[in-house]
């Protein structure tokens, strides 16, 4: 379902980002199927060749690209997605730590908390590897770094104990939020060709309900930690529920809603969190 990985010329990305900033944009997202596998050189645009060759010099990695964009202007917020647990490097984490305008947030899909299921999914890492990456994030970037994930429950042959491994992984990490689904066959995929979709729909739905319930609990507990704290927020627009309120996001990618008070869309404001639910922070401009 995917072609060979290609990395776009970093200088063209830098130029585009600078032009966007000069035209009034305050936030950009570096987007890729797996941004951490980014590797580019004038001599070759082939990740495998660049990784194997000792002769090719001046290779630009994703951490290099991220820093190039961060340096354009401190008022330009930079996000990126999606990271792969096997490829994200400490160099990337160091760039996040170094530059305030690189958002304090990482989407790191786990998919499952069980190593056997991860192997069947062809994820190329196991549970311990993933947890070590989470440890690196919290150690280098900080414990306040926003972390989200993806989970697929009811994958082929997943047992009840293996499902519980996913629940225990969630308890270990405590994600800010997650995207959660139950497994359904996609024609032409490796899983569809190799494995029987043998977990009943009833079981899939029940397991999905369990991980959603746990994530909602974790999201609320993480959001409660923000109450009485003040965050720099980029005003993104008017709240869907009231024209008297604006909405924006913190560096940690948390949605926050607050009264207008003459704040302009596209500007930064300091907002103090007053209350929250599992999905949204509610605050006031300082």
Which residues does each PLM region occupy?
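Small-residue (G/A/S/T)-rich helix-start motifs and N-terminal tracts that mark the onset
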Residues: 9-27
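Conserved, mostly hydrophobic/aromatic
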Residues: 13, 30, 80, 108, ...
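Conserved SAM/AdoMet-binding glycine-rich loop
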Residues: 22-161, 171
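Active-site proximal loops enriched in glycine and acidic residues that flank catalytic Cys/His/Asp
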Residues: 32, 82-84, 110-112, 149-153, ...
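C-terminal, non-catalytic macromolecule-binding modules
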Residues: 165-211
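Terminal RNA-binding accessory module
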Residues: 191-286
